[in-house]
């Protein structure tokens, strides 16, 4: 079985590093790149294969919602949104789910809690694996439906 190739998109270098470290605990996940904004993410996916994207909701240059729209337009890919636990962040996360994101995570805020909690680590890993699997099922059935229509 091939590794799940993950692109991390977050304006915080700290969060990018933390997510990389957490995801790479699982040998079936390979973080292929970590970029700081949506513009860099779009450029990356146009020339590099990615199975799952973790995407921050609030970023400069191109926010998570605009980035998600562009991802779904140019190269539909399963996206797990990361959001802070603010009201605005929650609203944007629900909008992202409507636009095609497959899941969301509350953005980790306490590195000491994260590094000592296997529940949080497992949750992040599980959501990335689920995103990859669910998206593959979606496209499998979508292609079958298109064939039936023809």
Predicted feature residues:
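Strand-loop microenvironment adjacent to phosphate/nucleotide-handling motifs in alpha/beta enzyme folds
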Residues: 1-150
